[in-house]
Amino acid sequence: MKVILLDSIDKVGKIGSEIIVKSGYARNFLFPKSKAVLSTKKNLAIFKKQQHILKSNLDSKRLKAEFRAKAINDLGSITITVKSSIHGKLFGSIGSRDIAKLITESVGFEVHKSQIRLPNRDALKSIGEHNVCIHVYNEIYANLTVHILNSVLFQDKSKKS
């Protein structure tokens, strides 16, 4: 099925591209989310007229994304305290959902778990520093350091005082 993209989509195409996709992908994803329209002469003419509006919308989304990436980069790092073994292995793990929740609380805007890129595409399972990448928008990324500390150490120190 031939469609015209109304938004840039990773690994598919940029705004205004006329591409061929499977009909199920178009019907179930692109059309309901208003990311594409069926490629016809009439739709091509309408798209040409509205192209500058779509470009300005895309530019405003890009500016928002750059602002969000800067806010996350300015945050620099977040600290998580969890229980762990003597050897530094966590009882459980820290996943993208946990990190997204902490970032959302810290910066004041929503960061979805699907935007978090963990090292080795696996949950964090040990104490220490871990570098995490956040995919904010198409080619805009932010970097963050996650410090994982043992909560038992902090409780023992507070009991002795």
Curated annotation (Swiss-Prot):
Q: Does the keyword Ribosomal protein apply?
A: yes
| A family per Pfam | Ribosomal_L9_N
Q: Does the keyword RNA-binding apply?
A: yes
- Disulphide bonds annotated for this chain are none
Keywords (A to Z) from UniProt:
Ribonucleoprotein, Ribosomal protein, RNA-binding, rRNA-binding
**GO MF annotations in UniProt:** rRNA binding; structural constituent of ribosome
Which superkingdom is the protein from? Bacteria
Q: Name one GO biological process term.
A: translation
Cellular component aspect of the GO annotation: ribonucleoprotein complex; ribosome
InterPro entries tied to this protein: Ribosomal_bL9 (IPR000244), Ribosomal_bL9/RNase_H1_N (IPR009027), Ribosomal_bL9_bac/chp (IPR020594), Ribosomal_bL9_C (IPR020069), Ribosomal_bL9_C_sf (IPR036791), Ribosomal_bL9_N (IPR020070), Ribosomal_bL9_N_sf (IPR036935)
Return the similarity comment. Belongs to the bacterial ribosomal protein bL9 family.
What HAMAP family does the entry give?
Answer: Ribosomal_bL9
| Function comment | Binds to the 23S rRNA.
Protein name, please?
Large ribosomal subunit protein bL9
Q: Which organism is it from?
A: Blochmanniella floridana
